[in-house]
Structures are given as C-alpha cells and as structure tokens.
A protein has these predicted regions:
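Binuclear metal-ion centers of metallo-dependent hydrolases, dominated by the metallo-beta-lactamase
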Residues: 39, 46-149
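Active-site-proximal loop/helix segments of hydrolase catalytic cores
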Residues: 1-60
Length: 149
C-alpha cells in the first residue's frame, strides 16, 4: 500500500485541499494520504443537523497532512442556540431582535504560484486587522509549498 500511495502522490499530491461534503466522515483514508496537503479548507456551517466537520475527519486530515504544523480551516466558527441564552438577564425586550445567532467564517486563498496566502475572516477586528493570515512559500528544493510562521 505504501508504494502505491507514494506513486499516486506523484500525480495527485496537492498543496491546498478543499474537503468534500462539509467534512463528513464519508472519506477514504488512503485518498487523504495520497493528497498529503499542507493546508485543507472545509466549507461547513450551513445550519445543518450533522455536526460537520466530523471530529474523525479533522483528526485524519491533520494526521495525513504534511508539515509539522499542517493547517485546517473551517468556515464554521460558532453557533449559539436558544438553550444557551438566558434572556432573563438581558435588559432589551425588543421582540424583533434575533435571539439565535449563527456566525460563519470566510476563507480566502490567493496565490501567484510562488507564494500563497490563506486568510480567515475574524469575527471581530483585532487591532487594525479583520483577517487571520497564514503564508505559504514555494521551496525550490522540496518542490512544494511550506508554511511560513
């Protein structure tokens, strides 16, 4: 199996992967091993009942990604439900205010072929920035992108 995975990487290895189906647990470990990305983006958070991305999916992506600090980005940042809100402590009683709030992240990927930037929009501005930015640079010797901390 290892030989087949290494041969397949010559044709299918990627630097940045986009996870299929919101990070569900319906995936092939062997396929993830072949992809061997340095970063993976998971689009999730469409107010669905499946708890995507799944914990086993996140673990497997991390385990079979390359680099000491592989990157996993998910558009799902936070959710709150009515069972967690204590409205009796709020002074506002305006019934038109929305009480259940869902916030999703926005992820941008940009590259010129030698550098790549993956930026995730923050929920709140920190200092003067609205983005959490991660940089990848092309390593000529390894012929692959590397995460620059």
């Amino acid at each position: 199996m290892e030989k087949a995975i290494n041969i397949a990487r010559d044709f299918l290895q990627v630097d940045i992967a986009k996870s299929c189906h919101h990070g569900s647990s319906d995936f092939s470990t062997e396929f993830l091993r072949v992809l061997n990305p340095i970063a993976t983006v998971i689009s999730s958070g469409d107010d669905e009942p499946y708890a995507h991305p799944r914990p086993d999916t996140l673990g497997t992506i991390g385990k079979y990604s390359r680099g000491e600090r592989s990157l996993i980005f998910s558009t799902e940042l936070a959710r709150s439900g009515q069972e967690f809100l204590d409205l009796s402590k709020r002074k506002e009683t305006d019934s038109t205010l929305e009480r259940v709030v869902t916030v999703y992240g926005m992820i941008n990927v940009r590259t010129d072929g030698k550098k790549a930037i993956i930026a995730q929009k923050l929920e709140k501005v920190v200092g003067s920035t609205k983005w959490d930015i991660h940089k990848l640079e092309w390593n000529e010797q390894k012929e692959a992108f590397e995460y620059i901390m």
